[in-house]
UniProtKB/Swiss-Prot annotation:
Species this chain originates from: Arabidopsis thaliana
Protein name, as recorded: Sulfite exporter TauE/SafE family protein 6
Alphabetical UniProt keywords: Membrane, Transmembrane, Transmembrane helix, Transport
Similarity remark: Belongs to the 4-toluene sulfonate uptake permease (TSUP) (TC 2.A.102) family.
GO biological process: protein ubiquitination
An annotated GO cellular component: Cul4A-RING E3 ubiquitin ligase complex
InterPro entries, per the entry: TM_pro_TauE-like
Superkingdom of source: Eukaryota
Membrane topology: Multi-pass membrane protein
Membrane-spanning segments: 1-21, 61-81, 82-102, 105-125, 128-148, 149-169, 245-265, 294-314, 332-352, 356-376, 388-408
Length: 428
């Protein structure tokens, strides 16, 4: 009996030793895999440092990035959500271009899509664009973008990534909510159309197309200015971060204030007779008018920090302020065209590299956006399910959020483990 007991104890000891050895082997294997992953990511990040200065050559990765950008522009234009969120991740993760170079490429691609949007919106819906509101919002919005770009240089990368992920998650929720609203409205409109004659149904259908098109069309496309304070010299003689540069940058403050005050005065004088003489209504109207520059500055500030523009930010704020959805979307699209165009010109002035490739991507996104708009006008109303595309874009934004969050956490761990400075930095 004692012999069996001793033998049983020995067998348990052998199993315990084998289990411990196997656990150690698994831990070593997991640690080795983790180190290999970190090494590959670090090697990839190192290879991106000089990509903005190197000349881009035609490669499979660049072709895949072009196809993905074309698809993103087409789907986003068809849904009316916009595609500014997808360009930078595609160019950074697929084409292997660093974030600053990807931002400059995104500016040109947004410009191409904005041209298609302007042709479709401006010439077809002139009465929906509130030019006084655009003049009121644009100066403070551009000023906010300039301040946001400086914050982008000062803030650490992990903070910008975290803020961007939070904002992207909020935008995804807004997109899905808009898709749900579009779904319910399409059902209601479908029931009403069945009860009317064919002529009234056709009129209602066209109005519905215009409503959804201007409610969701490219309200977040605008300039991305992350390389505004770059080190390279452009075709201008003023060096970035020099005394002349800061003086020129500071001049935006009085100019923005002057144009905003003039726009406020003009708007008040034009609408003075249309406002009720009641004091409460007058004060409420003045409060909303004063809030518009503040909201546009906030939109430009966040847009400059994230490098994706402020269209997606200013549009919900205008809707909450009581501006009709059609006027909000059309006016924002009108503002975005000039902002995106100016952004591309500024990148050229600051010595942007690989301009030929940026032109090609801009043309690609122009045709993709045009096809997306045609699809939204001709195909989507036939099936009466525009909300499906909106849900699709919302899902894509959720996936982009997960990828950006995972990559940001991994990069933060690598930089912290390597002992790099992860705090705030000087703008120059």
């Amino acid at each position: 009996m004692k012999t069996l007991f001793v033998l049983f104890i020995l067998i348990l000891c052998v199993f315990a030793i084998n289990a411990n050895q196997q656990e150690e082997i698994n831990q070593e294997s997991t640690q080795q895999t983790h180190q290999n992953l970190l090494y590959k990511v670090q090697k990839w990040r190192t290879s991106l440092k000089d990509s903005s200065d190197a000349e881009l050559k035609l490669s499979p990765a660049l072709v895949v990035a072009g196809v993905l950008c074309f698809t993103a522009a087409l789907i986003s234009s068809a849904s009316g959500i916009g595609d500014g969120f997808f360009f930078i991740p595609i160019m950074n993760l697929v084409a292997g271009i660093d974030l600053k170079a990807a931002s400059s490429f995104s500016a040109f691609m947004v410009t191409g899509g904005s041209i298609a949007n302007l042709i479709n919106n401006h010439f077809g819906c002139k009465k929906l664009i509130d030019y006084d509101l655009a003049l009121l919002l644009e100066p403070c919005m551009l000023l906010g973008v300039s301040v946001g770009v400086i914050c982008n240089k000062v803030f650490p990368e992990w903070l910008i990534t975290g803020l961007f992920v939070v904002f992207l998650m909020w935008s995804s929720m807004e997109t899905c909510e808009n898709g749900h609203t579009s779904w319910k409205l399409s059902l209601i409109l479908r029931e009403k159309e069945d009860m009317r004659d064919s002529r009234l149904a056709e009129v209602k259908r066209r109005r519905t197309i215009i409503f959804f098109k201007h409610l969701y069309l490219k309200i977040k496309k605008t300039e991305t200015k992350q390389s505004f304070l770059g080190r390279n010299l452009g075709i201008i003689s003023i060096k970035p971060c020099s005394v002349e540069y800061w003086i020129l940058l500071s001049l935006q403050i009085p100019l923005a204030l002057v144009f905003t005050i003039l726009a406020l005065s003009r708007t008040e004088s034009l609408q003075e007779q249309s406002i009720s003489n009641q004091e409460g209504t007058r004060l409420d109207h003045q409060f909303k008018r004063l809030m518009f520059p503040v909201m546009s500055f906030l939109a430009g500030l966040l847009g400059g920090i994230f490098g994706i523009g402020g269209g997606m930010i200013i549009s919900p704020l205008l809707l909450r302020a009581g501006i009709p959805p059609q006027v909000t979307a059309a006016t924002t699209s009108f503002m975005v065209f000039f902002s995106a165009t100016m952004s591309g010109v500024q990148y050229l002035l600051l010595g942007m590299q690989n301009t030929e490739a940026a032109y090609v991507f801009s043309v690609i996104c122009f045709f993709a956006s045009t096809l997306g708009l045609v699809f939204a006008q001709k195909v989507v109303p036939h099936f009466r399910r525009a909300s499906i595309i909106v849900f699709l874009v919302g899902t894509m934004m959720y996936l982009t959020t997960i990828v950006m969050a995972s990559f940001g956490i991994l990069v933060f761990y690598i930089d912290n483990d390597a002992g790099k400075d992860i705090g705030f930095q000087l703008p120059c």
